[in-house]
Amino acid sequence: IEQFEDAPRSQPNLDSLRILVDVSRNGEMKHLRFQTANDHAQVFTEIDVDISENGHYNLHTIDFGAKLSRTDIEIKLSAEQASTKINGLAVTNGSQYHDTHLAVEHRVGDTQSAMTFRNMVDGKGEATFNGRVLIEKNAQRSATEQSVGNLLLSKTARVNPKPELEIYADDVTASHGCTVGSLNQNELFYLKSR
């Protein structure tokens, strides 16, 4: 479990984090990440993951805080039967900006990845999600799923979703989808009153 908090401050501050994960053969890692930095913080996070044979990496990431948050996640499926599952949520309000870049590389065959990411944006907030899956030519029988959902809670909120699939192999299973929606006044009132 990784929990990032900042003490309340009146001045801007910069935080930079780098996380390196190596999932060994037959290994499994469950990574829970919570980012609740103060309203003035600028938080830059880089997560690099390499997964070996029959290794599994599951990431659940939630971003609430920071004036500016940039998260770069790079996952390499380096051996057969390696898999990853990523679930993410960014809740943005005021004038916050949350920017998430996620890249998954299927380097060999018989690998699996699934990513589900959600943005909820209110006020003048803005959220960007760039999810890229690369399936190399020799990564036959790989499977990937990608789902990006965005909910705008105000007329001034903005989202920039960009799901990408780059496939060079012939024998793969791949799907991706992206939605952007908003709520009417009654739905928004109901949601905020609960």
Name these PLM-found stretches.
Residues 1-189, 193-194:
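Conserved beta-strand/loop scaffold segments within soluble protein domains that form the structured core
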